[in-house]
Amino acid sequence: MENKVPLLSLCIPTNGRAEWVVPLLESIYSQGEDPALFEVVITDNAANPDLASAVSAMAHPNLKYFPTKSAGFTNQVDAFEKCSGLFCKMLNHRSVLLPGSIRMLLSLVERYRTEKPLIYCTNGVLKTKEEDIDCADLDTFVKRLGIYASWSAGTALWREDLQDIRSKPINSTFPHTVFLFDVREQGPYLIWDGHYHELQNDATSGGYNPFEAFGITFLDLMSRLLKEGRIQPDTFEKVRKDVFLFLRTLHFKEVVLPAKHGYILTDIPEKMSVYYGRRDYRIMVLYNYSVAPFELGANKVRKIFASLKRKVK
């Protein structure tokens, strides 16, 4: 790379999951983009020798692997610190980039390298007519994002915003929020809603209590912004409602239905009561168990049709 600063750094924090990271890397390098324009930085807090060997075998000059000792999700901060690109974009280690997505990200950098807004990438979930959504202030930014602000993989920032990052308050559950809320006192802010990746199988995801993480910790972060006057009460309420709907869906899938992931699901009523109260918890449970028979019946019908289709083939 002749010591030139790449336009784009793709940051991949992981806990040694070679079975996910390798397909992600393949989806990156199969696009054939000029390696001088971007770099890929992996930080692995499990220090998996299999992943290290797989990365070494790929022998790409712009691919960097760093074992780290940071606990849990704070590995995300390590990934950004190891980057040297003008623009740093986090990737979920379970993602696979879509064809042409690196070119899309490089174009994004070129469009905004002068203005340098704080950018968050929502991967098409907002379904807006325009992919580039300007936000005048943090309140507008948070209101448009809602619960998606909790999604670390959408995080992106300019290299210059990384100065003194360790002096900022870093939340151990949502460390990416330091980049969204604390590296700058004001905008400009931009949401990019381009669709650039898909997720691989998440059957083994989990390992934490989502009712504590989202229902308490994430809303604590929103409450701080409200108390500081950086977001308005209606924005906080919008995010609170978003989180409730998310937790209701998660409760339905992880508690009511038989299919389970590895989440910790203890003390749900107590955790829900912090920002919602026992009444909302009871409404959630009643709703989910009233819907369950219909969903289970629909699943059974889908399985029967799938079985018949296989037999026809």
Predicted features and spans:
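Cell-envelope/extracellular polymer assembly enzymes that use nucleotide-activated donors
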Residues: P6-S9, E39
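Short, well-formed alpha-helical segments that are part of the catalytic scaffolds
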Residues: R17-Q31
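A conserved acidic beta->alpha catalytic loop
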Residues: V41-S53
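Glycine-rich, basic loop-to-helix element that forms the pyrophosphate-binding segment
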Residues: P67-C83
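Short aromatic/hydrophobic "clamp" motif used to bind/position activated sugar donors
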Residues: C88
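Conserved donor NDP-sugar-binding/catalytic core segment of glycosyltransferases
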Residues: V96-I133
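Conserved nucleotide-sugar donor-binding catalytic segment
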Residues: C135-A213
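C-terminal subregions of glycosyltransferases and related glycan-biosynthesis enzymes
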Residues: V178, E185, I191-K313
